[in-house]
Amino acid sequence: MESIELKVRPGAEPAGAVDELSGRVPELKAQWAALLEQAAAERSELLELPPYELSAKPSKNFQVIGMLFKTIQAHQRQNEYPKSVALCCLTEDDATMYRQVYNFYIPNTKAERMNSGLWD
């Protein structure tokens, strides 16, 4: 079973700022794919990815985080490992943005949405 989860870690070191990374999405996609492939080769149950400092511009967050979700989902469809990918977020508001991006791009049905219990 494929799984993507969010973990709020306020003290975690960001892997970068979305404002600076939005112009490097193909490079980021390759880096994420390499991390997923390494986790698959090691048969890791869990791959935990560091947080990103989100942008004040939602469009940039959708561009970067959307590609992150798409990359993870494509890998999980083709590979058994990692069984779960945990995306760290710096704040609850960041986790909400991640959920919004996920729900925009990934689920085909309402039941597949990532929900914190705050929405319908």
Predicted regions and their residues:
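Macrodomain-like recognition of ADP-ribose-binding/processing modules
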Residues: 1-120
